Amino acid sequence: NSLRGGLWLERGRRSVTRDWHRLLDTRIGMNYDHRPYWVQFKDAYELDEVMYYVEDVARIGAFAARIGVKQFFVDQRRDERINGQQHVRSDSESDPLFSAGLTWATPVEGMEVFAGFSENFAAIPSGVLGETDPVVLSRVKPETADNIELGLRVSRWPLTASATLYDIRFDNRIVYVPASFVDGIDYLGETDGVYENYGGVHSRGLETALGYGWDNGWRLSGAHTYNKSTYLGSGDAKRDEALEIVEGAQVFGIPKHTLVLSADWQGEAWNFGLSGRYLGERYLDASNSEKIDAVTLFNAHVGVDLVDISPRLKGMAVDLTVNNLTDKRYLSGVDGGGSAFIGAPRAVSVALTVDF
């Protein structure tokens, strides 16, 4: 049995400024007057964070148990240096956050069963302080999440395998909403909207992985993820509809199925690898009205230890990597507004590694 604890202290100071400068002569170039003709805003941000944790680990025969608790205290401030010299402050204090885990080393060599639970907390982002009226901000709560997992893993040469069931509930999601959605007195002035807590996300799924190696240097591996992430509503049907959030709809940009397969070979001097990644269909928006097709991409790499060429090159290696091997045209990230970003074309890179 072992008991340990710790304390995390963080102190941050930063400033954000936007100023405008006159271009001297656009016919010649982009040279500009270094003295701004207008400073739009100049804000100072301060952060003071304290986190403590206590954890106890006990081992009884084939079982190992862990239980812990931690708590966050986050004090953030934003001060305007010009304009209205507004002062905004946010004190985020989490509840005591509990976590627990249990593992069982089964009678089968290399096989282990595990389970875990954890509570998580995310303080209000500092950017929210600059976008939300102080009165409205006082009603914003930190985001929270509860994680549960249950799984099995095997590590016994030449086989490695794992399967994990998970359930994650994410609450108090902070989103930007139009000013017309704000209840009560309009404190916004000229602001178009504010940040508020709005529903959440419920994710559950299964992650599996399998790998097998041979003594001749070859190894095959694969991993599959089934992920069902759906939106939780706010409890106000009209607000949900106005924000185009459908309770139970799949989170945009998140595929239900992801599959990765790879083959790698490691010799005395040379190494080689080829991998393929399948991304399932993804929705473009929170209402799931449009989606983009699934895509499969391939990557490859080859490397050599230069000591095989000359003993004087000991500790040096060269690696060639090709991403998007077939130069596939595809859509990658999704912005949630019905648009997607164009994926990167074929990219070739060479890296030299030197060990001293």
Show the residue positions of the predicted features:
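Membrane-embedded beta-barrel scaffold of Gram-negative outer-membrane proteins
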Residues: 15, 105-120, 141-213, 220, ...
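Outer-membrane beta-barrel "beta-signal"
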Residues: 344-356
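Surface-exposed loop/turn segments flanking beta-strands in extracellular/periplasmic regions
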Residues: 14-40, 89, 133-139, 177-193, ...
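Gram-negative outer-membrane beta-barrel transporters
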Residues: 59-64, 74, 167-169, 190-286, ...
